């Protein structure tokens, strides 16, 4: 599933081609996504100019003068900017024809993504209750410490909660906890402020590095020009169960938490 770095990579890729462009035509080949594509989407978009392409958590927004399109990539979705004469591919469900002879195409084999229309994106039910962005000034160790008091939740589950902080998916939670030296099953309420400062910094460092490398491609994700991300080559623990820890050479262990793979060093992470 595309996580925050993959979605941010997509935003950076499509924004230069979309911002300031007029949407000449909307093509919906298959409206049956996670939620049905609005039947009147073309009425809202055609003839309108894309003022900005922004990201909030794992959602992308195409902001127009009258409202915004909310796009989620789901499990396997991607947005690509292509030349005007490129034929449509299988699973190209939604397409915007732009005034610069480019097309923005949404491809989603599993159809868990979405295209929605809203006139007030900040108050949309999908957005309004989200926690802070992990790369923003609002997110720090003090924030994690304050929200974690009395929490019996494992810290890995805690930082993956979008009400606490957005965009820390399974891969990046594994990596950040390793860098911070914190065991993924340690109770969130039993972690000190100092250790939360280290964890917040590890989350920022991990996500920033992943964005610079175009995200992590393990199966489905490709960016806006159809190329994979390369952060998988820099992973320290995720997918490396049994390999020696890069810090102490102890074999890394794998457990399941909430039915997700969790890899950690039993010596370095406490």
UniProtKB/Swiss-Prot annotation:
One GO term under biological process is:
base-excision repair
Q: Does the keyword Hydrolase apply?
A: yes
Question: Mind telling me which InterPro entries this protein's record contains?
Answer: DNA_glyclase/AP_lyase_DNA-bd, DNA_glyclase_Znf_dom_DNA_BS, Formamido-pyr_DNA_Glyclase, FPG_cat, MutM-like_N-ter, Ribosomal_uS13-like_H2TH, Znf_DNA_glyclase/AP_lyase, Znf_FPG/IleRS
- State how the cofactor is bound: Binds 1 zinc ion per subunit.
Could you confirm whether the keyword Zinc-finger appears in this record?
A: yes
Top-level taxon: Bacteria
Query: Where does the UniProt annotation place the signal sequence?
Result: none
Q: Which residues bind DNA?
A: 91, 110, 151
Which Pfam families has this protein been placed in?
Fapy_DNA_glyco, H2TH, zf-FPG_IleRS
Q: Catalysed reaction(s)?
A: Hydrolysis of DNA containing ring-opened 7-methylguanine residues, releasing 2,6-diamino-4-hydroxy-5-(N-methyl)formamidopyrimidine; 2'-deoxyribonucleotide-(2'-deoxyribose 5'-phosphate)-2'-deoxyribonucleotide-DNA = a 3'-end 2'-deoxyribonucleotide-(2,3-dehydro-2,3-deoxyribose 5'-phosphate)-DNA + a 5'-end 5'-phospho-2'-deoxyribonucleoside-DNA + H(+)
Q: EC number(s) in its UniProt entry?
A: 3.2.2.23, 4.2.99.18
HAMAP family for the chain: Fapy_DNA_glycosyl
- Biological function: Involved in base excision repair of DNA damaged by oxidation or by mutagenic agents. Acts as a DNA glycosylase that recognizes and removes damaged bases. Has a preference for oxidized purines, such as 7,8-dihydro-8-oxoguanine (8-oxoG). Has AP (apurinic/apyrimidinic) lyase activity and introduces nicks in the DNA strand. Cleaves the DNA backbone by beta-delta elimination to generate a single-strand break at the site of the removed base with both 3'- and 5'-phosphates.
Quote the protein name from its UniProt record.
Formamidopyrimidine-DNA glycosylase
Give the organism the record lists: Marinobacter nauticus (strain ATCC 700491 / DSM 11845 / VT8) (Marinobacter aquaeolei)
Question: By which gene is this protein encoded?
Answer: mutM
């Amino acid at each position: 599933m595309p996580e925050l770095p993959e979605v941010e990579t997509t935003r950076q890729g499509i924004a230069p081609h979309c911002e300031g462009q007029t949407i000449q035509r909307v093509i919906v080949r298959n409206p049956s996504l996670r939620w049905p594509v609005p039947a009147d989407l073309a009425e809202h978009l055609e003839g309108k100019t894309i003022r900005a392409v922004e990201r909030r958590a794992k959602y992308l927004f195409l902001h127009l003068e009258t409202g915004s399109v909310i796009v989620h990539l789901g499990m396997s979705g991607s947005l690509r900017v292509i030349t005007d004469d490129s034929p449509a591919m299988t699973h190209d469900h939604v397409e915007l024809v732009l005034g610069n002879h480019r097309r923005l195409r949404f491809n989603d084999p599993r159809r868990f993504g979405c295209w929605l229309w809203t006139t007030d994106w900040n108050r949309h039910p999908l957005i309004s209750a989200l926690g802070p962005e992990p790369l923003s000034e609002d997110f720090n160790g003090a924030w994690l410490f304050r929200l974690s008091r009395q929490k019996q939740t494992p810290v890995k589950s805690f930082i993956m909660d979008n009400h606490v902080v957005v965009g820390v998916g399974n891969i990046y939670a594994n990596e950040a906890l390793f860098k911070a030296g914190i065991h993924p099953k340690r109770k969130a309420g039993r972690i000190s402020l100092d250790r939360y400062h280290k964890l917040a910094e590890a989350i920022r460092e991990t996500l920033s590095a992943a964005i610079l490398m175009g995200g992590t491609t393990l199966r489905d994700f490709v960016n806006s020009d159809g190329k994979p991300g390369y952060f998988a080559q820099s992973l320290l623990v995720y997918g490396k169960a049994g390999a020696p820890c890069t810090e102490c050479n102890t074999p890394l262990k794998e457990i399941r938490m909430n039915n997700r793979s969790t890899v950690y060093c039993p010596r370095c992470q406490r």
